[in-house]
A protein has these predicted regions:
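Conserved Helicase C-terminal RecA-like lobe
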Residues: 71-75, 81, 89, 94-98, ...
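Walker A/P-loop NTP-binding motif
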Residues: 61-66, 85-100, 196, 227
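Conserved pre-motif I regulatory segment
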Residues: 28-79
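Inter-lobe coupling linker of SF2 helicases/translocases
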Residues: 149-150, 154-155, 168-171, 192-202, ...
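Conserved Walker A/P-loop ATP-binding site and its immediately adjacent core
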Residues: 100-120, 376-379
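A conserved SF2-helicase RecA2
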Residues: 473-482, 486-532
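Conserved helicase ATPase motor motifs in RecA-like P-loop NTPase domains
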Residues: 82, 203-216
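Conserved helix-turn-beta segment of the N-terminal RecA-like "Helicase ATP-binding" lobe
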Residues: 111-132, 230
Length: 532
């Protein structure tokens, strides 16, 4: 990136009038005016002015206004840790550097959240390009709208009857600015949604995600390709660090001086408690071969995992969590010789994992902390719910069966946020933080969540104990899950319990132990985001 000072060979002095200095001074004035406008705006909408947000807005405005952007790219990657206000940065850019046409692309779970943010902070209801609205609106009308919100599914091209790709009305418009929220949804280069994102035309592009790397460096390359940085992206890690130093903004809570209660993590190693359970686990694991993984072969291992029969991996995980999940698959496994013909799943009376999770939750009841349990399967959620309720605890759950509009209500158990606001004349009638206080009284003792359904769009800072029943392949998913509770507003320390089944004998590791090792290597790869 070029220096912000004029050419050292130019005779500097009072009243320097070179074109470059004049441009920079003009840009600085515009940025300063926008920052002051932001400061004046904050009190009226109930935003506390924070230094890290001012610095973030200044960074964003520079990358929108810079006369000659690096590699010709305006915008960048906003990768601040969850809870630092990435959405507010984008709202500030929209308000204080107004553009004629801004498109926001996001997961469906965040649609109403973003609409609410616009209504609250800007007094504007954006057009939602989805469903019948998308079908009926004309391209001319779309081009006249200042803000359009849509989902990743809507930018994905459709295959026509003659096997050609048809792009949406959104692709026929020259957008001033595009914001991709939860941009890690674009990490797969081979998907139609990534192709659709690359084909959208815009002067400014923002990728907003706390996890720009989920599995491997190619995730980051995929985002850079949408930004327009593919030609300057190299495999050299030192050059990648230089590139990120220009185009990526990443801060942690610690770095910006936000002091939250600590997160304490405990790995709970679980032994196989019965011979029947161990015997079946050994048979199922015998079908898998776990290759040693390190930073040099992590990309190849991830590719292998993607090619490996999903059923075998799924069965190994289900066996570790709750063997009864395999009930329908037993006949097929017997037919293929994976397990003996005389093996009966009914002989497995209990699940070592379920027993351990329930015992820990019930045993920790006296802490007074509410428990957030992240699970993988509906059957697992159902049995945990039954056992915890039998122990006298109040339990709610969220899984793929839960409609988006019901998720917040289940977290609160008694009343939803819209219902609460309906008794107030306006949003501003609510004392700051009052809803969080009410949450702390209404939330259930235990909330069980299917991990892939609740890592976006939900704040759960009224829970202080987190349980992962089984490790996820992607550590970023677990980090996001923890961040739902460990965020601004959390007043107690957060205890995290990670349950892992032990190995099955000498030099034999369980599926979950291998999964945990894969996580460790992926975390090492992610350190490039922190310039390490």
């Amino acid at each position: 990136m070029s220096s912000l000072n004029c050419d050292p060979s130019w005779p500097l002095g009072d009243g320097c009038s070179c074109w470059r200095c004049n441009r920079l001074e003009q840009q600085d004035r515009v940025t300063a005016d926008s920052l002051q406008a932001y400061r004046d705006w904050c009190p009226g909408v109930g935003i506390d002015e924070k230094h890290h947000q001012l610095q973030g807005i200044k960074w964003c405005l520079y990358h929108e206004l810079v006369e000659k952007p690096n590699a010709g790219v305006r915008g960048g990657i906003i990768a601040d840790e969850m809870g630092l206000g990435k959405t507010i940065l984008m709202i500030a850019c929209i308000r204080h550097n107004f553009k004629a046409r801004t498109l926001i692309v996001l997961p469906p779970a965040l649609l109403q959240q973003w609409v609410g943010v616009f209504q609250r902070f800007l007094g504007h209801t954006p057009f939602v390009y989805r469903g019948s609205k998308a079908k009926n609106v004309t391209i001319e009308k779309l081009a006249q709208l200042p803000v359009v919100i849509t989902t990743y599914g809507m930018i994905s091209p459709r295959r026509t009857d003659d096997d050609k790709l048809a792009y949406s009305k959104l692709h026929k418009i020259e957008w001033s600015r595009i914001i991709y929220d939860e941009a890690h949804h674009l990490r797969n280069l081979k998907t139609k949604v990534h192709d659709g994102a690359c084909m959208l035309k815009a002067d400014i592009r923002w990728m907003v995600t706390g996890t720009p790397i989920n599995n491997k460096l190619k995730d980051l390359y995929a985002l850079c390709k949408v930004l327009g940085l593919a030609k300057v992206f190299t495999p050299n890690k030192e050059e990648i660090k230089l590139l990120l130093g220009i185009h990526l903004l990443r801060r942690t809570k610690d770095q910006v001086g936000i002091n939250l209660p600590p997160v304490k993590t405990q790995v709970v190693e679980v032994d196989w408690s019965s011979d029947a359970e161990r015997d079946m686990a050994e048979d199922i694991h015998s079908m898998l071969h776990f290759t040693t993984i390190n930073k040099n072969n992590v990309d190849e291992i991830i590719a292998w995992l993607n090619r490996h029969p999903l059923a075998a991996l799924t069965r190994a995980r289900q066996m570790c969590i709750y063997p009864q999940l395999l009930h329908k698959a037993v006949k097929k496994m017997k037919r293929k010789g994976i397990i003996p013909q005389d093996m009966n799943i009914k002989d497995i009376k209990t699940s070592s994992k379920i027993t351990s999770v329930v015992d820990h939750i019930v045993g920790n009841r006296q802490t007074g902390k509410r428990k957030l349990v992240f699970s993988h399967y509906r059957g697992e959620i159902d049995v945990l719910t039954e056992k915890l309720r039998n122990a006298g605890m109040t339990v709610q759950s969220i899984d793929g069966r839960t409609k988006t509009r019901n998720k917040k209500q289940r977290i609160l158990s008694v009343v939803s946020e819209p219902q609460f606001h309906s008794v107030c004349k306006t949003w501003n009638d609510l004392p700051e933080g009052i809803f969080g206080v009410i949450n702390s009284f209404l939330a259930p003792e235990v909330m069980i969540v299917q991990i892939q359904t609740a890592c976006e769009g939900l704040n759960m800072q009224h829970f202080q104990e987190i349980y992962f029943t089984s490790p996820h392949w992607n550590p970023a998913v677990e980090d996001q899950a923890v961040a739902r509770a460990h965020r601004i507003g959390q007043e107690k320390s957060v205890d995290v319990y990670r349950f892992v089944m032990n190995g099955l004998g000498r030099n034999s590791i369980s599926f979950e132990q291998y999964c945990s090792h894969v996580q460790d290597i992926k975390r090492e790869v992610m350190q490039i985001l922190n310039n390490k």
